[in-house]
């Protein structure tokens, strides 16, 4: 299937001199002829609170379509909740359910999750990592079943700054949640996070676990387990928010002529490639170049499915 290109709207919320409104972003992305936008439901961008009624959500859905765009997914704001350090994830799940309804009303088919708490949580709170792992599995089991009721895939974005950031943990988490009957659960393969987790081993607690083949070897290990893709470069560093620096394409260390063919062979069911400029200062200034970079790769590898 031919790939469609979107960009995460959170790029224009976080770490910017001034937050760019969602409506202005839609105009800009339409002018750049992107295929879609991935909704970062944060700040002044659309949230269940800013669009509380079905009518307001219908208007938002139409607004996006009127700009020639589609939603590639949604990233909900769940960072005020806990997942690993609590026995009862009810507050997290209640908020997640609200976002499921919001996503369904907007016609969105995929919702993002992360582990919410840092990898240091186990030592800090004296939690057995296995207990924390099991808590996440049980919570995401419920989340996946709620999401399925709303026609949603659940995509876990593993990151160095969140718990379960070792390559073996990433594979094990996908398998454990799917083993509970959740075929709608999968990994979000973010190229910079994959590099930082698999090649650099950033922020890993205890003994560091890396792969000789870095992000591409992790991609191979996750074959059949990935349901969404975020693409951006990496210079091997963390930013001030303790997550991977999302370098614009061509300014980091990743060779996308190696990554793209492997991604196309990885059996990923999604036809979206989402550009992720999270926390990059003045993100709008590099948006057009990011689109052109991916567009050239799409054209170059069209014969094998790009």
Predicted region positions:
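Active-site beta-loop-alpha junctions enriched in small/polar residues
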Residues: 8-14, 40-42, 76-79, 116-118, ...
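Boundary/entry segment of secreted carbohydrate-active catalytic domains
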Residues: 1-21
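Alpha-helix N-cap and loop-to-helix initiation/capping positions
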Residues: 17-24, 48-59, 87-95, 124-138, ...
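Acidic/histidine-rich catalytic cores of soluble enzymes
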Residues: 37, 141-248, 253, 305
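Hydrophobic faces of well-ordered beta-strands that scaffold small-molecule active sites
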Residues: 3-9, 37-39, 71-76, 111-113, ...
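Glycine-rich, proline-tolerant flexible connector loops at the mouths of alpha/beta enzymes
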Residues: 38-64, 115-121
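Active-site acidic/histidine proton-transfer and metal-coordination neighborhood
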Residues: 23-24, 28, 63-66, 82-189, ...
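C-terminal helical cap(s) of enzyme catalytic domains, especially alpha/beta-barrels
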Residues: 284-305
